[in-house]
């Protein structure tokens, strides 16, 4: 590195020329002493320059190491955030499962209640309508029959009484008794009809309550569907955010691997060129030493 090439060229003594056998030996030059002094000075300068370059390289590596530590601390924080995001995502999935299960149970219960109430309502409505029709027909038939009976009895008895007695007093007494009996029968019939009407009103009130309950259940079902749709939207958004976070983590991991590879190459170039430098290394912490060793 640095002055390595110049050290080879300027720090070695000049080679001696080979003398021929027939030539007499030449005397050694008198300037050998100063030449050896210059060579030692040059070696010292080259060693100092090389030590300075090694020191700068190690300082640069340590600075890069500090930057890497900061980046890795940020990366650890990001990974913690991603881990927290994954835990939140798992909790969200569990809550979604519980929500879906509760919604399914509630929906099934709602459908069962709705079906039972609808069936009960239809049966009560049909029975009530049948009772109304039957009572109406009975009343109409009874009224027609009573009218015909009254007309027939009154006309026949009136004519017979006139033929037998020639007086109307006894006839009217009998007619009053007959009318009293008819009125009693009608009163009993009216009481029976009143009871049935009260029963019909009770059934009608129950049907109204059932209709209100069905309406309430339908509204709750619509609310549950709306909440389910909102939950699905939030779930999709969280899934998209998680996917983006994973992509960012993958890019950061690739960048870190590339940085690690560049660091190893730089350390190999710096430390592999001269395994035993002839200068004191700067003081480094145990963490930096372990980093350089890796």
UniProtKB/Swiss-Prot annotation:
Family indicated by similarity: Belongs to the CCDC69 family.
Species lineage: Eukaryota, Metazoa, Chordata, Craniata, Vertebrata
Chain intervals with Basic and acidic residues compositional bias: 20-29
GO molecular function, one term: microtubule binding
The UniProt record lists the keyword Lipoprotein: yes
Keywords: Coiled coil, Cytoplasm, Cytoskeleton, Lipoprotein, Myristate, Phosphoprotein
Subcellular location: Cytoplasm, Cytoskeleton, Spindle; Midbody
Top-level taxon of origin: Eukaryota
Residue stretches in coiled coil: 47-270
Phosphoserine: modified positions: 152, 239
Cellular-component GO terms for this entry: cytoplasm; midbody; nucleus; spindle midzone
Region feature Disordered, mapped onto this chain: 1-43
Functional description taken from the UniProt entry: May act as a scaffold to regulate the recruitment and assembly of spindle midzone components. Required for the localization of AURKB and PLK1 to the spindle midzone.
Record-level GO BP terms: spindle midzone assembly
Database matches in InterPro entries: MTUS1/CCDC69 (IPR051293)
Protein name per Swiss-Prot or TrEMBL: Coiled-coil domain-containing protein 69
Covalently attached lipid (N-myristoyl glycine), positions: 2
